Amino acid sequence: MNNVIDFWPTLKRLLYYGTNVKKYLILGFTLLLFSSIFEVLNPILISCFIKHYFINNTVNYSLKIITYYLILQILAAILNYHQNIIFNKISLTVIQKLRYDVMSSTLQLPIKMFDQRPIGQFISRITNDTETIKELYDTVIKSLFQNIILILITLITMFILEWRMACIASIIFPIALIIMLLYQYFSKPILRKIKVYIANIYNIFNEIINGIDVIQQFHQEQKFRKSIKKISISHYYFRMKILKLDSFLLRPLLNFCSTLILCGLILIFGIYPIGFFEIGTLYAFITYLNRLNEPLITITSQQSIFQQAIVAGERIFEIIHTPKQQYGDDSLHFREGNIKVKNLYFSYTNNNVYVLKNINIFIPSKQFIAFVGRTGSGKSTLSKLLIGHYPATLGKICLDERNIQTFTHNVLKKNISIVQQDPIILNDTILENITLGRNISTKKVLKILKTIKLIQFVNSLPKGLKTLLGENGNILSIGQKQLLSIARTLISCPKILILDEATSNVDLDTENNIKKILSSVKHLTTIIAITHRLSTIKHADNIFVFNNGEIVESGTHYNLIRKKSYYKNMYYSQAIKN
């Protein structure tokens, strides 16, 4: 029974989006009302035509009735055309607002959401689910209102014409209600599973497109074909279940019930003496029963679309209602850029399995600091905490003697920048990839390109800064992408600069270039380099060595090399390999 009841909160939220287009809704429903009235009047006119032409033989009056009938048909067609335009406009406006809201909420979600969920799930909800809700507005709501009006007017007319026959015809309503409730109960869990499989299909295609080089290199095509086939078969299975449910509970069952009621009407007509019911009245009732049957069939058959929209709404509102990334309200910018981490513990889950344990460090401003350690030792995790993506489980992080959790998003964004191992390059110009829409002069951009030694390459391009870089910067080498990523961070003059494995994928020349860049900006910003390449951080002011989520030692390169240390073993082991 819960499946029948729990759609109301979601439906109310979906209908609330229509309040922004109240005027259009009122106009659309008004046009629907009049077009429905005109449609209901047509059988009465035909009934009168039969009476006056075939029985009373009054030709002139019959011609008038035909004229009225044609006028009503034309008016109904005009009104239907305009209300279709209006409801399509309403649905597009509502979906535009809904997509904006879900996209806006997605942009503010905690980073852990993207770490824990496949990207395909988000794409499915933003595209496929919102398109499903569009059908709720341009098909279901319009049709529901129109058919309810048709049913009410038809019923009133039937009771005015002949109440006995009307009572028999009304039996169809409780039957239709039972069918709708049964359909709703059985269809909702199936539709939820269909949505999950659609999201999985989006996700696997996203993986294939983004990782096509690796898939082909390691001959994994067959594995992904099997994955697609498995998900597609599951999707097909549940689609067929819903189609079978539609085929049994919707149109066929209602048609059968309607036929039984029609037999009942004919039986009543036959039981009463000849002349008790006019032949025109019987014709009108047969017509009205069909008119009743069609709206009820439409309403029940649209239960599938309605249920899909409710399930899609639940998935969308789950994103919208997810607590956003939490920031404080301290809008005072950094003065220096020093960092203090005290008694810090961190776990990605709530099971007390800490990936960082008892971290205590102090980093003075404008120093070059390095975090080193083997893969999985906790270096990059600490960087995520330093930029505010995750809160500490225990302990605290202070920037400029203030708790990081008190800062606004804007302050953190302007004062802390990070260069990732795999730079994200937009399908835009070089200029836009550096400025990212910020109000930065071309002169300043050229200056930073000169600093990172990309100016010669940019000047060699026919369009210079206006050159389009293509999908993920496909006209650039890996080293050039990384230098461009460094340029976009340095141009905003951050107080703290974090380089997370920024040199791991570049050649030796680019690595040396990056070292020179860091040396030139060292007096302007606090630099934290997270790296496996120990040769790049030999001149760091302090090196923190991580192992199993703990800092096991710290000091300069030369101090750590002089004594028997974990760092020394790492350094010489790497030197021998090189």
From Swiss-Prot:
<feature type="transmembrane region" description="Helical">
    <location>
        <begin position="196"/>
        <end position="216"/>
    </location>
</feature>
<dbReference type="GO" id="GO:0005886">
    <property type="term" value="C:plasma membrane"/>
</dbReference>
<dbReference type="Pfam" id="PF00664">
    <property type="entry name" value="ABC_membrane"/>
</dbReference>
<feature type="transmembrane region" description="Helical">
    <location>
        <begin position="26"/>
        <end position="46"/>
    </location>
</feature>
<dbReference type="InterPro" id="IPR011527">
    <property type="entry name" value="ABC1_TM_dom"/>
</dbReference>
<keyword id="KW-0472">Membrane</keyword>
<feature type="transmembrane region" description="Helical">
    <location>
        <begin position="143"/>
        <end position="163"/>
    </location>
</feature>
<keyword id="KW-0067">ATP-binding</keyword>
<feature type="domain" description="ABC transmembrane type-1">
    <location>
        <begin position="25"/>
        <end position="308"/>
    </location>
</feature>
<keyword id="KW-1278">Translocase</keyword>
<dbReference type="GO" id="GO:0015421">
    <property type="term" value="F:ABC-type oligopeptide transporter activity"/>
</dbReference>
<dbReference type="GO" id="GO:0016887">
    <property type="term" value="F:ATP hydrolysis activity"/>
</dbReference>
<dbReference type="InterPro" id="IPR039421">
    <property type="entry name" value="Type_1_exporter"/>
</dbReference>
<keyword id="KW-0813">Transport</keyword>
<keyword id="KW-1133">Transmembrane helix</keyword>
<feature type="binding site">
    <location>
        <begin position="373"/>
        <end position="380"/>
    </location>
    <ligand>
        <name>ATP</name>
    </ligand>
</feature>
<dbReference type="GO" id="GO:0008559">
    <property type="term" value="F:ABC-type xenobiotic transporter activity"/>
</dbReference>
<dbReference type="InterPro" id="IPR036640">
    <property type="entry name" value="ABC1_TM_sf"/>
</dbReference>
<comment type="similarity">
    <text>Belongs to the ABC transporter superfamily. Drug exporter-2 (TC 3.A.1.117) family.</text>
</comment>
<dbReference type="Pfam" id="PF00005">
    <property type="entry name" value="ABC_tran"/>
</dbReference>
<dbReference type="InterPro" id="IPR003593">
    <property type="entry name" value="AAA+_ATPase"/>
</dbReference>
<keyword id="KW-0812">Transmembrane</keyword>
<feature type="transmembrane region" description="Helical">
    <location>
        <begin position="260"/>
        <end position="280"/>
    </location>
</feature>
<feature type="transmembrane region" description="Helical">
    <location>
        <begin position="59"/>
        <end position="79"/>
    </location>
</feature>
<dbReference type="GO" id="GO:0005524">
    <property type="term" value="F:ATP binding"/>
</dbReference>
<protein>
    <recommendedName>
        <fullName>Multidrug resistance-like ATP-binding protein MdlB</fullName>
        <ecNumber>7.6.2.2</ecNumber>
    </recommendedName>
</protein>
<keyword id="KW-1003">Cell membrane</keyword>
<keyword id="KW-0547">Nucleotide-binding</keyword>
<feature type="transmembrane region" description="Helical">
    <location>
        <begin position="166"/>
        <end position="186"/>
    </location>
</feature>
<feature type="domain" description="ABC transporter">
    <location>
        <begin position="339"/>
        <end position="573"/>
    </location>
</feature>
<dbReference type="InterPro" id="IPR027417">
    <property type="entry name" value="P-loop_NTPase"/>
</dbReference>
<dbReference type="InterPro" id="IPR003439">
    <property type="entry name" value="ABC_transporter-like_ATP-bd"/>
</dbReference>
